[in-house]
């Protein structure tokens, strides 16, 4: 394991790409988190502080000096991408191209977009690339769609772009260019790299006590990936199955559903936290996939109960108070 202080300029460089692994939680920073980050860094910029630290970035090195999985710090890293994308849009050339290279570089010969510096979870990446990195407008129709689906990560991305736009609109272009330069050259993170998924997994659990606490669903999902053995060829398949569960139930209601599922399986009162109650259940299962299959079946029944979708009149009447 290695740790070093690095400027944002060395983090968001043309040679390095980052991916959010499937076992990570989705983007969840709220408007207040973004306002605080912007306000704190702007205050340091105005005070001409020599350096300003914004926390740690813990990664697994998949390709030396080129590709990293983000274990901790993805909320800040994603938000930095939002900020630089909007700073790019707010300034003129040549600063626009300079900042654009930090988030979505282009081939200078063909003008085609290349691989983004950051890739989010599969479910969120298309929205992130189109509406954050490529600055495609988030129309009212798109906003209504993500609201109706209660798609929390996309709602957070959309809302936080609005926070950043409001913040930048109050400053002139010269100030924004100087602020962007300060962000790149005077703002630091502690950059930690490990080559081992097992080491990263231990760090992931230890770091749950810091920052935004992980939900029980996040921790249960993490245990499933641990049972799988980390970044195997099966991880994408497991991630897709979990995403289908999230979409069916809704991220905001997932903890509640998992509590009901545990009660229906064990038929005993919980004595520990929800994710601790799930640990022996996951360990006793044949595979993570068979365990998730059982949860998926339970989810379908749960949704029928929630929707009171039974033909039997007596059943509908008994479920109505729930």
What does each of the following model-derived ranges do?
Residues 90-95, 210-214:
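Short, polar/flexible loop-turn hinges at active-site or ligand-entry regions and domain interfaces
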Residues 13-14, 20-25, 29-31, 55-60, ...:
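Generic structural "secondary-structure junction" signal
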Residues 76-93:
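Short active-site loop/helix that positions an aromatic residue
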Residues 123-322:
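Polyanionic (Asp/Glu-rich) segments that form extended negatively charged tracts
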């Amino acid at each position: 394991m290695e740790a070093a202080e690095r400027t944002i300029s060395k983090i968001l460089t043309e040679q390095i790409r980052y991916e959010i692994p499937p076992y990570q939680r989705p983007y969840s920073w709220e408007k207040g988190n973004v306002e605080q980050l912007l306000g704190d860094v702007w205050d340091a910029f105005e005070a001409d502080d020599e350096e300003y630290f914004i926390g740690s970035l813990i990664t697994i090195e998949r390709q030396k000096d080129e590709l990293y999985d983000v274990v901790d710090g993805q909320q800040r890293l994603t938000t930095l991408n939002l900020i630089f994308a909007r700073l790019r849009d707010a300034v003129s050339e040549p600063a626009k191209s300079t900042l654009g290279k930090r988030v979505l570089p282009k081939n200078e010969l063909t003008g085609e977009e290349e691989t983004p510096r950051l890739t989010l979870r599969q479910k969120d990446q298309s929205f992130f690339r189109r509406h954050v990195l490529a600055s495609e407008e988030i129309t009212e129709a798109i906003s209504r769609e993500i609201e109706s689906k209660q798609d929390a990560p996309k709602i957070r991305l959309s809302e936080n772009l609005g926070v950043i736009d409001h913040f930048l609109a109050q400053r002139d272009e010269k100030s924004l260019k100087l602020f962007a330069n300060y962000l790149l050259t005077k703002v630091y993170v502690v950059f930690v790299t490990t080559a081992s998924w097992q080491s990263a997994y231990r760090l992931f659990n230890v770091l749950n006590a810091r920052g935004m606490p992980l939900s029980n669903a996040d921790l249960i999902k993490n245990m499933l990936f641990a049972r799988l053995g980390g970044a195997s060829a099966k991880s994408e398949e497991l991630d897709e199955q979990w995403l289908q569960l999230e979409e069916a139930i809704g991220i905001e209601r997932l903890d509640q559903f998992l509590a009901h599922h545990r009660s229906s399986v064990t038929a005993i009162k919980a004595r520990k936290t929800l994710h601790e109650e799930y640990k022996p259940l996951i360990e006793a299962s044949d595979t993570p996939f068979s365990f998730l299959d059982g949860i998926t079946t339970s989810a379908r029944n749960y949704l029928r109960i929630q929707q009171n979708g039974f033909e039997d009149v007596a059943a509908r009447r008994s479920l109505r108070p729930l």
